[in-house]
Amino acid sequence: MHCPFCGANDTKVIDSRLVAEGEQVRRRRECVACGERFTTFETAELVLPRLIKQDGTRQPFDEEKLRAGMQRALEKRPVSVERLEAALAHIKSRLRATGEREVKSLVVGEMVMAELRKLDEVAYIRFASVYRRFQDLDEFREEIDRLAREPARE
């Protein structure tokens, strides 16, 4: 690694330790040329797949868009931010686990529905009504009946 002080190419690691609950490595380095010390942090780069929209267009995964959609469904519901963040982390983990470079947005939508169903049934119905484009009360009733018949999968 280049020294940020003198630009020399040769630095040595004098200490390494895990930080951020094991998600990051902190390294103390020393420049062989000038003797200055500095700290670097390493994290794994975890790339999420691109999304294939229903119209065939492709776009990068947008965590903020996902969070906003789930927050909208959970608005004024008794679900903590921690539980929402855990659900988001679970969705991202499942997407990475597919090993695919691209996934259909429908797959992500179904993952969101499954997570919302575990978090809060009212939020699930709110999201489902928009996601599945309910047209009338009968479609709401059918989804509520399905919710009552089929327990949420953990």
Curated annotation (Swiss-Prot):
Stretches annotated zinc finger (unnamed): 3-34
Keywords: ATP-binding, DNA-binding, Metal-binding, Nucleotide-binding, Repressor, Transcription, Transcription regulation, Zinc, Zinc-finger
Manner of cofactor binding, per the entry note: Binds 1 zinc ion.
InterPro entries: ATP-cone_dom (IPR005144), NrdR-like_N (IPR055173), RNR_NrdR-like (IPR003796)
Biological process terms in GO annotation: negative regulation of DNA-templated transcription
Residue ranges constituting the ATP-cone domain according to the UniProt record: 49-139
Swiss-Prot/TrEMBL cofactor(s): Zn(2+)
Highest rank taxon of the organism: Bacteria
Single GO molecular function: DNA binding
Database matches in PROSITE patterns: ATP_CONE (PS51161)
Pfam families with a match to the protein in the record: ATP-cone (PF03477), Zn_ribbon_NrdR (PF22811)
Function text: Negatively regulates transcription of bacterial ribonucleotide reductase nrd genes and operons by binding to NrdR-boxes.
Family listed: Belongs to the NrdR family.
Record protein name field: Transcriptional repressor NrdR
Organism: Pseudomonas putida (strain GB-1)
Lineage: Bacteria, Pseudomonadati, Pseudomonadota, Gammaproteobacteria, Pseudomonadales
